[in-house]
Amino acid sequence: MSSGGLLLLLGLLTLWEVLTPVSSKDRPNFCKLPAETGRCNAKIPRFYYNPRQHQCIEFLYGGCGGNANNFKTIKECESTCAA
């Protein structure tokens, strides 16, 4: 294969890696945790990944405590946990 062909193949493989969504085996374990509002009483809109529905869902975060399955934006949730 020519060097141009190898460069094209390398470029395509790199692009595929970047555009491929997170697979369940690569998903962090905290994505499996339930939504947890925390100990405080604020009502801050946040997102968590629901593994049964395979999507990010909005919930109201209390402002303190909780767990790592808690994202400020749906985009952040999807890029971290959604397949």
Curated annotation (Swiss-Prot):
It comes from Pseudonaja textilis textilis. Serine protease inhibitor. Does not inhibit plasmin, and does not reduce blood loss in the mouse tail vein blood loss model. Belongs to the venom Kunitz-type family. Disulfide bonds join 31-81, 40-64, 56-77. SUPFAM superfamilies: BPTI-like. It is found in: Secreted. PANTHER family: KUNITZ-TYPE PROTEASE INHIBITOR-RELATED (PTHR10083). This is Kunitz-type serine protease inhibitor textilinin-3.
